[in-house]
């Protein structure tokens, strides 16, 4: 189930099409705390989607608008700038050491497939916050390579080609 909670921290998307998905983690284990932060105008931060550890999804910004998730200096590829204006941002509730739950990843894969299908995003353009701000960010990998990038790219490829892919979310332990 997905609920929509409008964030004031957004702008109208310019005529640039969506070509990236940027995946983050929240650096917190609190879904409700992240919701409060994203709807606080003083925070000046948001994402299009938040995926909780139980698989719950909240949407804060319509995909037609710009969420403020990647930072103004973010570039992908290097030299192109403007990541927020051409991307969809997804935050996963988690920290550098918490890893991700099976329920959370299952919801992420379904969400990611829909976004890729709607916007025709190439699998190599499903990236992490660490990719667009490498000198400042480590998410969603955290302290080690815990994010399953091969699965994310397989889900994106399957969504583009309308083929099935068998994915396993992981453990909810």
Describe the role of every protein-language-model region.
Residues 1-121:
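Active-site-adjacent loop/helix surface patches within enzyme catalytic domains
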Residues 85, 95-173:
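Basic/polar, cationic surfaces and motifs that engage anionic cell-wall
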């Amino acid at each position: 189930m997905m609920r929509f909670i409008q964030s004031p921290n957004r702008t109208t998307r310019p005529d640039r099409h969506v070509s990236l998905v940027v995946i983050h983690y929240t650096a917190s284990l609190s879904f409700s705390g992240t919701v409060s932060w994203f709807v606080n105008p003083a925070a000046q931060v948001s994402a299009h989607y938040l995926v909780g550890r139980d698989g719950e999804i909240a949407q804060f910004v319509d995909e037609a608008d710009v969420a403020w998730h990647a930072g103004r200096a973010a570039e992908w590829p290097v030299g192109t700038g403007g990541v927020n204006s051409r991307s969809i941002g997804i935050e996963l509730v988690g920290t550098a050491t918490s890893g991700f739950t099976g329920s959370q990843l299952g919801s992420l894969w379904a969400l990611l497939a829909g976004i890729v299908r709607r916007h025709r995003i190439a699998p190599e353009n499903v990236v992490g916050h660490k990719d667009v701000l490498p000198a400042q960010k480590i998410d969603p990998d955290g302290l080690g390579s815990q994010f399953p990038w091969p699965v994310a790219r397989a889900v994106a490829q399957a969504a583009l080609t309308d083929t099935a892919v068998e994915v396993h979310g992981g453990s909810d332990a």
